[in-house]
């Protein structure tokens, strides 16, 4: 009887931890996680490898010292691809700026990793250029300087239907892809993604939003825009669809013109200009991540995506994955110290940061 119990326990333990899913700080399966790689700040003593971690079971950030560690969170999750079974697993790495080729400025501005077996898998959205490598996990030295974002969701294999459609709309550029025949048969749109085939010329719908459930039943919303949408995914799609004011952190250091804070009668989307992350203050110019947080406690949305708020990206594909989680929302909302206000006097800036609330109360003149 004792031997029988040990064998049963061993099978359950091995199977539970052997699932292809997002991995936590201990390398164990988790429903979803967020990682914020901190920028290299000489005055604060950060090396550019430190990160903070939050998942479905967290109440606050957990600090990590080395984003390059293959055994925790991002590293443990991505490393599953390198040991995957080619005949039985689907995998996909995509990037507009991958480790193999020069940057692509025509197709979608999007970066991610996905891996599935016949039951479950994960989708990881990230902002890191030249990442991940094709043979084994490592984090590029060139991406240590700026802040970066990661959002991973574990999901059942049937959601490859929605993911394939999402990748087709955003024109995700594959640099590693493996589609066994059983996946190609069940999810034929994956072959369109592999062949870089996008929407037909007859298409009239240039954006989609789809609910996707994690393995634990959390509903996420995936938003995708094709380049012919010709608009800002944050303001023209996510803010308007959810009827919320957003603060968006994105890369605004490029050569293209910035869109700037957008305030209309139907939506407001503010560019973040200054942040405080776990006690570290830094300007948006130190950050390459792409995320948004709502200003609504009744609709506490946090989104992680592909797109910068620059005019050149209006005519490129890209997406975002959004989650409603009050603990995560409170953390991200508290990050925002300053946003660019509405320019027009006819629109009152609706995003209330810590700085604006304290200033309005007469407690501080400037933070």
Swiss-Prot record:
Origin: domain of life: Eukaryota
Glycan attachment residues as annotated in the record: 253
InterPro entries (UniProt xref): DNase_II
GO BP term (any one): apoptotic DNA fragmentation
Keywords: Glycoprotein, Hydrolase, Signal
GO molecular function: deoxyribonuclease II activity
EC number in record: 3.1.-.-
Signal found in the keyword field: yes
Signal peptide stretch: 1-18
Family per similarity comment: Belongs to the DNase II family.
Name the UniProt record assigns to this protein: Cell-death-related nuclease 7
Organism (species): Caenorhabditis elegans
């Amino acid at each position: 009887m004792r031997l029988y119990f040990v064998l049963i326990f061993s099978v359950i333990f091995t199977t539970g931890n052997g699932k292809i899913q997002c991995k936590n700080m201990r390398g164990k399966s988790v429903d979803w996680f967020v990682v914020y790689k901190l920028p290299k700040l000489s005055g604060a003593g950060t090396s550019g490898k430190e990160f903070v971690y939050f998942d479905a079971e967290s109440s606050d950030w957990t600090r990590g010292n080395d984003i390059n560690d293959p055994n925790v969170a991002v590293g443990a999750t991505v490393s599953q691809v390198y040991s995957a079974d080619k005949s039985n697993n689907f995998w996909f790495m995509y990037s507009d700026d991958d480790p193999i080729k020069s940057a692509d400025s025509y197709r979608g501005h999007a970066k991610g990793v996905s891996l599935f077996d016949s039951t479950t898998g994960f989708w990881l959205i990230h902002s890191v250029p030249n990442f991940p490598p094709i043979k084994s996990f490592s984090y590029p030295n060139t991406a240590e300087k700026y802040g970066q974002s990661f959002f991973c969701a574990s999901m059942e294999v049937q959601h490859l239907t929605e993911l394939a459609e999402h990748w087709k709309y955003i024109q995700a550029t594959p640099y590693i892809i493996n589609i066994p025949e059983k996946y190609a048969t069940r999810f034929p749109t994956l072959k369109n993604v592999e062949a870089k085939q996008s929407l037909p010329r007859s298409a009239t719908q240039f954006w989609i939003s789809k609910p996707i459930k994690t393995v634990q039943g959390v509903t996420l919303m995936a938003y995708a825009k094709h380049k012919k949408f010709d608009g800002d995914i944050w303001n023209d799609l996510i803010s308007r669809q959810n009827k919320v004011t957003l603060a968006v952190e994105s890369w605004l250091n490029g050569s293209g013109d910035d869109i700037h804070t957008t305030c209309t009668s139907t939506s407001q989307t503010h560019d973040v200009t200054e942040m405080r992350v776990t006690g570290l203050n830094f300007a948006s110019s130190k950050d390459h991540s792409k995320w948004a947080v709502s200003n609504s406690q009744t609709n506490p949305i946090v989104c992680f995506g592909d797109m910068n708020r620059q005019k050149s990206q209006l005519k490129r594909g890209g997406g975002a994955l959004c989650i409603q989680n009050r603990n995560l929302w409170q953390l991200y909302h508290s990050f925002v110290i300053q946003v660019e206000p509405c320019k027009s006097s006819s629109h009152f800036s609706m995003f209330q940061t810590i700085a604006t609330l304290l200033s309005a109360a007469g407690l501080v003149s400037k933070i």
